[in-house]
């Protein structure tokens, strides 16, 4: 990956497009603790451990604790974004589209979830406005639900009956559930989750044969799955 990205950057310089190219580089989910053992309790890759602070984020890919959601996010735009700067702005993937739209002057469709982070990237003085903030961030995945507001995070694991609440400013590892001592905070975050939830609508799911093909490809099988069998119709004949 490093070599191929380097080749892209080098080509941009050769074509004199380097300072006209805004690049986003990110992971898609938290790490997975592959090959766990007594010697490597978090797996050989030490999934979701902050190398600078030593904080071990709870969870992994596929769950909605911090370890499943925190990802690297790097933005590059030579001549526009100052290098070697670290931001603590809270954002997520839907922010990429409006950021690109603002940078290019494109018109955005209505009703999108993201906000532009261009002021955070360029500096508010260069962008000509202050950076807006999300009221909250919301996730749903395989029965899990989570919502974050500031440093508060409420999580409801799959099949759980009760919500959990964590103060990430004091407990980034999410080791102490403080729901019982902060009922009003939890109530507020659950209300946000209820506001954000959209029930599944009939007829909007995708074709299952595509997912079956992807699943088989992960196992090294690149053949086409068998098409679904057609159901026989009952035909009534008159005697």
Residue ranges and their predicted role:
Residues 1-38:
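Metal-dependent active-site segment of extracytoplasmic phospho-/sulfohydrolases and closely related
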Residues 3-7, 16, 52, 95, ...:
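Extracytoplasmic/secreted proteins, especially bacterial periplasmic and envelope-associated proteins
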Residues 5, 12, 22-27, 72-73, ...:
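Beta-strand elements within well-structured catalytic alpha/beta cores of enzymes
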Residues 6, 10-17, 101-105, 122, ...:
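Sec-exported extracytoplasmic/periplasmic mature domains
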Residues 17-23, 70-71, 133-134, 149-152, ...:
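Loop/turn elements at helix/coil->beta-strand transitions in domains of secreted/extracellular proteins
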Residues 33-64, 81-85, 89-168, 199-200, ...:
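C-terminal cap/loop subdomain of S1 sulfatases and analogous C-terminal strand-loop tails that border
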Residues 73-75, 91:
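Short glycine- and hydrophobic/aromatic-rich loop-to-beta-strand nucleating segment
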Residues 96, 150, 154, 160-162, ...:
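Long, internal low-complexity/basic segments
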